Amino acid sequence: MADAFMAAGARVFICDVNAAALEATLASRPSLAGRVCDVSDEAQVAEFFVAGMAHLGGLDVLISNAGVAGPTANVEDISLAAWRQCMAVNLDSAFLCARLAAPVLRAQGSGSIINMSSTAGLFGFPRRAPYASAKWAIRGLTRTLAQELGPFGVRVNCICPGSVAGERIDRVIAAEALKTGRSEAEVYQEMVHAASLKTLIDPADIANLALFLTSSAGARISGQELAVDGHTETL
């Protein structure tokens, strides 16, 4: 996502809870800046926002892109702590960031917010109750913010990715295989065949949609939930 926006000429300020990962990312991209931040922590988000505003000199686009998979288990086997941790990272983070961005964008009369939902926010998702619940809630937050901020020229949309190729989906596949007693190859094939296009999603597909929505080409698009998922038929 950051690479795509920088390639389009944007100045970008990112965060990561993993200090080593952030350091490696910034070292390989001299024009990129960022700060270590746990986006479920109110104080850390406030510090991140202050640092980002100071570095960028303003704000045009906020992309709330942090997320964790949460537990893979039947609902009766999920602890309240695991539920809350999943909600904190996937939902609270978007709220905390939007709460800080809204006054800035409203005052300048322009800007765009992109929240990251999921196809899990469009379907029920067995054994993933916390994750699906958070992603459904992101849709509600998005529509509400679109109504609140629209009169001030601020657009708010959410993207609903399908199964995105990469290390994260590999961990999800492994967890599902372990829980259900199937092989990882079987779970992978099930994911691929859940979409009409019979393919996983490339991260660039999501970044390209975010670029479109935040550009002048998306100037009249707000309050929308756009799936980048190869047309998921079922989860």
Language model segments and positions:
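Residue(s) in the substrate-gating loop at a strand-loop-helix junction
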Residues: S118
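Substrate-binding pocket helix/loop in short-chain dehydrogenase/reductase
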Residues: A73-V75, A82-M87, I113, M191
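Short C-terminal tail/terminal secondary-structure segment
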Residues: A69-T72, F123, T199, A210-L211, ...
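Short, small/polar-rich loop/turn modules that mediate ligand/substrate recognition or access, typified
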Residues: G150, R155, I221-G223
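C-terminal helical subdomain
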Residues: C158, G166, R182-A217, I221, ...
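Active-site helix of classical SDR
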Residues: A98, A134, T142
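Canonical Rossmann dinucleotide-binding motif of NAD(H)/NADP(H)-dependent dehydrogenases/reductases
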Residues: M1-F13
